[in-house]
From Swiss-Prot:
Pfam families: APH (PF01636). Resistance to kanamycin and structurally-related aminoglycosides, including amikacin. PANTHER family: 3'-PHOSPHOTRANSFERASE, PUTATIVE-RELATED, AMINOGLYCOSIDE PHOSPHOTRANSFERASE-RELATED-RELATED. Belongs to the aminoglycoside phosphotransferase family. This is Aminoglycoside 3'-phosphotransferase. It catalyses: kanamycin A + ATP = kanamycin 3'-phosphate + ADP + H(+). It comes from the Bacteria. It is an enzyme of class 2 (transferase). The active site is at D189. GO terms for biological process: response to antibiotic. Its EC number is 2.7.1.95.
Amino acid sequence: MAKMRISPELKKLIEKYRCVKDTEGMSPAKVYKLGENENLYLKMTDSRYKGTTYDVEREKDMMLWLEGKLPVPKVVHFERHDGWSNLLMSEADGVLCSEEYEDEQSPEKIIELYAECIRLFHSIDISDCPYTNSLDSRLAELDYLLNNDLADVDCENWEEDTPFKDPRELYDFLKTEKPEEELVFSHGDLGDSKIFVKDGKVSGFIDLGRSGRADKWYDIPFCVRSIREDIGEEQYVELFFDLLGIKPDWEKIKYYILLDELF
């Protein structure tokens, strides 16, 4: 606690809680779980990420906008202090989908939940959404991250069929081959570790820094990739699209998976 760059006001809010650092996440944010029963979470990003989708101020703005539209954590406190953005929030309601359902035991249920998420997202009115994650916006952000050595890139973890030798080559391809977009609400980083469930239904979402207006296909490739990697049978990819009532656009799916290699 002593090493945290937080204001006296925030310190007073959290001093009674037991503080445990979360080591699961892959983003540059620092995340702490506070408490054991009525939990709070403190998420912190340094000023180098200001204005990017990693910045917790952006996540705070989206959480406030999503109140009444989607089940999201409550914003308890936000501040910029000593070069850091600090977001204190409530715990999401329910249990993580990744903990509630085993992929090999409940594949149909997981597919149903992914489809439910996509339908929920696409039903939201985005006319006053505070952030746009169009490809122009994401690629401009990516250029900044690459130029400042802030991009989360590990070429060894790229998909086996990724034909690019380095991040800049992939970036150039993504900029040249941008598909047309039809904007809807998008989570931006969807997966079973971002979805909470309760009584068999979606009950919450976390990690909302990349949410906002984006192409309607933006979240779908994350679901397809998770189904293939975690369940492994192509029939469940087909079931996913059957539940959505659409045919897969494989070019867009491949494009957005490639884009995610650099975030």
